[in-house]
Regions:
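Intrinsic-disorder-associated, low-complexity terminal segments enriched in Asp/Asn/His/Tyr and depleted
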Residues: 7-8
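Catalytic cores of DNA base-excision repair glycosylases
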Residues: 17-233
């Protein structure tokens, strides 16, 4: 079959309707990542919550190296509250920001016990009340632990959405608003993972040639290519 590149290179990017562009992006991502895996290893909502919290300013690979020792020590909130914060900090030190993250892990474990019967809450509002849990972390847990449609925006999604002309890139909050308006709700969870994997493997921040990218080659406008070039030249 003819590749998307050949089909759409001649199409005016500005003339292409947002929904048409979104449909073509979905088709490419579905072909490339039909069953996108969740990058963070976990066994249940609690282990996912902790893993996502640890992933702030840290790679998923590093988190997956650290969490087995942490969960061997305390796989549940009940056991985690009995682990001294300093011990948690020592285990998670390779993930960075260990003082803040250790305090958050201990604190949220106590709240889960005291206020949620030891269970991770399945609402965005309750998750965001937990220490160390922001909107993105809560959204990831909602999507990947509970299957609730969510579009958490990380650095890869933020970058790709800007390159593809799906958002102006002013903030991750704006990017999330733009993407949930653009894609069908039932696709958000898969697309979140698909765009992350595409960003990591094909559309990286550095050493990226739009002409060789199966999406940027037709979706990225000349103006955005020029703007990215200027930023790199600084």
């Amino acid at each position: 079959t003819t590749g998307w590149n050949e089909d759409y290179n001649a199409v005016s990017v500005t003339a292409m309707k947002r929904q048409d562009k979104a449909a073509r992006i979905q088709a490419i991502l579905d072909e490339r990542f039909p069953k996108p895996p969740i990058p963070l290893d976990h066994q249940d909502p609690f282990s996912l919550l902790i893993a996502v919290l640890l992933s702030a300013q840290c790679t998923d690979v590093r988190v997956n190296q650290v969490t087995p020792a942490l969960f061997a020590r305390a796989p549940t909130p009940e056991l985690m509250v009995d682990v001294p914060v300093e011990e948690i900090r020592a285990i998670i030190r390779p993930c960075g920001l260990s003082p803040q993250k250790a305090k958050a892990i201990s604190g949220l474990s106590r709240i889960l016990l005291d206020e949620h019967d030891g269970e991770v809450p399945n609402t965005l509002a309750e998750l965001e009340k937990l220490p160390g849990v922001g909107h993105k972390t809560a959204s990831v847990v909602m999507a990947q632990a509970f299957g609730v449609p969510s579009m958490p925006v990380d650095t890869h999604i933020h970058r790709c959405a800007w390159r593809w002309g799906l958002s102006n890139g002013r903030s991750v909050e704006q990017t999330e608003r733009d993407l949930v308006r653009t894609f069908p709700k039932e696709r958000w969870n898969d697309l979140h993972l698909q765009i992350i994997w595409f960003g990591r493997t094909t559309c990286p921040a550095m050493r990226h040639d739009p002409e060789q990218c199966t999406i940027c080659s037709w979706a990225m406008s000349k103006a955005r290519r020029a703007e990215e070039k200027r930023k790199r030249a600084r």
